[in-house]
Amino acid sequence: MALIAAKDLAVGFGSQVVADKIDFEINSGDFVCIVGENGSGKSTLVKTIMSLLPPISGHVVLGEGLKRTEMGYLGQQTDVQRDFPASVEEIVLSGCLNSCGKRPFFNRQDRKLAEANMVRTGVLNLRRRCYRELSGGQQQRVLLARALCASTRVILLDEPVTGLDPVASAEMYRILADLNRSGMTIVMVSHDIAPALEHATKVLDMGKETVMMSVEDYNG
């Protein structure tokens, strides 16, 4: 069974359909790049997979025992979020909230996980810094570390390199590729198609029809 599957899915806001007739399967270990024009429903689809938006019709089915609370998510930042006055370590630790349950504090295991993910994303040396003082690339790596605290299996990312300079973008892609090689399933929305496809294994093209294909088929 697929890790994540859509069956005759329609997504949108309220009764307004943004994209429909969506069928796909994502398997464990895939690196899926979601592409399409502005307004084609890419971000809406990711939010629907995460249950941040309800489907208008159809279903998103999770397999292999995966729960939505076990999926990490890195969404697009607002200006308010970029200016959040917390330390890097506090931001990353907040990714452990799902595992806390009714426990009103972070334990030693949570802190070890946060530290390990700060190492993986190269932000451990920034742990005491205020988040809003960081560069855009540093902030994105902090948010990725937080998302990794929420999941060891699947990460969904919405335009993770938008607004980053070429060096910061390349570093983000390197980290994502390393995560995928270690077994993490990556699902990423991107307008930065060429570099994204260097690492992707599949493309979900949300054109006139939503089609899942190999990178080779997408490149023609």
Report residues per predicted region.
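H-loop/switch region of ABC-family ATPase nucleotide-binding domains
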Residues: 190-191
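Helix-to-loop junction immediately C-terminal to a conserved catalytic motif
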Residues: 50
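Catalytic Walker B motif of ABC-type/P-loop ATPase nucleotide-binding domains
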Residues: 155-158
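H-loop (His-switch) and adjacent beta-strand-loop-beta switch element
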Residues: 201-216
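Conserved ABC ATPase signature
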Residues: 130-134, 138
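Conserved structural motif at the start of ABC-family nucleotide-binding domains
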Residues: 4, 18-19
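Conserved ABC ATPase "signature" region
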Residues: 108-126
